[in-house]
Amino acid sequence: MARICLSLNRLKVAVIPVLALLAAGCGDSRSAKAPPLAENEASRIVPALDPVGMPRLRDSTLFELSYPAAELKGGSVKLHAGEWKDSLTPDNLREAYLTMVAHGDLNGDSLRDAVVILYTDPGSTRKFFRLIPVIASTTKEPEMLGGTVGYGAFLGDRVKPESLWIDGHRVWLRMVEPAKGDDPCCPTLWQQRTYRLVRDSLKLETTIPLGNHD
């Protein structure tokens, strides 16, 4: 029976959630597969300004960038409409896509940056998640920001990100990761992490255990 493992963020900064991260039985090698953000959000029109009236990176910009992915050939992946599939492999087994996006100021320049979670499947039982910053910059169009992809943080294999937001120039993440003795497919350790941007890289700042997650 599938479990819904992805919750909506209810805190201060608006977050664009994906639908649900489905975890099938422990014997399913694709149990940590998350639905693509673009696939579920493609019909939604996201305003260029967030509620406080400050310009932010458009999701359409984030969906077309290249992101680091060490387990894929070349070490990076160029997304189109928020996802990528390797058409040269049988059944498109290798793929990558965004599963979460949050907006907020990471470096104190009053521009709304973004942070994304990238899911990659290299065509094996292992499924990887990365937390990656996208640093906003001004363009000739006042309400259109450019984005530079920074260096992210590796979250792990078959972890379950649940909520993501930016507040106080920090990235906040709640996720479930394997505890000691867990089967890789079925993590139970619930944690809250904070990251801060140092130049163009995300650095882990705090980790707070939240207990076991059913």
Annotate the PLM regions.
Residues 22-25:
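C-terminal motif of bacterial Sec signal peptides marking the signal peptidase cleavage site
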Residues 2-15:
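Bacterial N-terminal signal peptides that target proteins for export
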